[in-house]
């Protein structure tokens, strides 16, 4: 924890967490509607559709936990929650990559939405590492 009066929280990181929270909520709802569209109009195998929807709900859980711990760690200037958020960035990135590249059918809208999610993940990872470095350097003083 930082000394009294010394603030090490990253404002750009907090802005990214806030924007990503709203963006992910929109992404999740749009992705549900896209799966409904795919299930009704495309010859989408039922097993694949169920798997993709279940994975989307798992992705929701991972992303909500990641954003919660990232925000908590940044605002409270704690390394452990921010480290958990960094660790959860990798499964989150893998899920976004799966929905970008490995689904049965990938629509152009999904490609754009997942590219934006990957941009958020990459930017947040960079700022989280910089913030963790700042927190660690203050512990040594």
Curated annotation (Swiss-Prot):
Name where it's found.
Membrane; Cytoplasm, Cytoskeleton, Cilium basal body
Residues passing through the membrane, by range:
15-35, 49-69, 82-102, 115-135
Membrane topology of this protein? Multi-pass membrane protein
Q: Which UniProt keywords apply?
A: Cell projection, Cilium biogenesis/degradation, Cytoplasm, Cytoskeleton, Membrane, Transmembrane, Transmembrane helix
- Tell me, which GO biological process terms does this entry list? cilium assembly; non-motile cilium assembly
Which domain of life, per UniProt? Answer: Eukaryota
**Pfam families named in the record:** Transmemb_17 (PF09799)
| Major location (coarse) | membrane
Subunit notes for this chain?
Part of the tectonic-like complex (also named B9 complex). Interacts with TMEM107.
Record protein name field: Transmembrane protein 216
